[in-house]
Amino acid sequence: MNVTSLSFPYGESIQWFCADNAKNLPSSPLKEWLLAPGSLTQKLKGCCDKFEVKILGEGQCAPLEGEYPKQNAVWVREVLLCLDSVPWVFARTLIPQSLLSTRQADFLGLGTRPLGELLFSQDSFVPGRIEIARFTTDSRLAQLAQSLAQNVEHELWGRRRYFHHDEEEMFVSEMFLPAAVQAMARL
């Protein structure tokens, strides 16, 4: 896997839309994956023999323009979710500093453990709304996919999910790479 042509953070400024208001959503089955209410990690694990998390980078960063207006600095974690060694999803998580010290979650010690396992195993983290975004074939996400030897012929899609813990909020963005879309069509 060669991702050396880009550097952490890979994310870019994105226009997210409420799933109810998003026009021209992709056709099934990608649409169902984008709108799935449960754990994406669990859903992905059901499609492979070997699931793994490859960390692209993590650290304290300023959020991108419009990404997290209430925060000057957040903990950013960017990973690839791989099924049988093939990257399916690029995930970008933003965690406010105030949540990093919560006893319910060791975000800094996650390593290659999937974040979804942690969030969906804790009652104190409540899944919130899902927003949708589409990415052009010249976006940074498309460049990342191409650096992974995945040909980008069509626009790419992703979702952003809010998770609430007490009065705090964090975001998990999951963008589907071309290999995932192709595999979904065969499921």
Curated annotation (Swiss-Prot):
GO terms for molecular function: chorismate lyase activity. Pathway: Cofactor biosynthesis; ubiquinone biosynthesis. It is an enzyme of class 4 (lyase). Its EC number is 4.1.3.40. Substrate binds at R77, L115, E174. Keywords: Cytoplasm, Lyase, Pyruvate, Ubiquinone biosynthesis. GO terms for biological process: pyruvate biosynthetic process; ubiquinone biosynthetic process. Pfam families: Chor_lyase (PF04345). It is found in: Cytoplasm. It comes from the Bacteria. Signal peptide: none annotated. It catalyses: chorismate = 4-hydroxybenzoate + pyruvate. GO terms for cellular component: cytosol. Removes the pyruvyl group from chorismate, with concomitant aromatization of the ring, to provide 4-hydroxybenzoate (4HB) for the ubiquinone pathway. Belongs to the UbiC family. This is Probable chorismate pyruvate-lyase. It comes from Shewanella sp. (strain ANA-3). The lineage of its organism: Bacteria, Pseudomonadati, Pseudomonadota, Gammaproteobacteria, Alteromonadales.
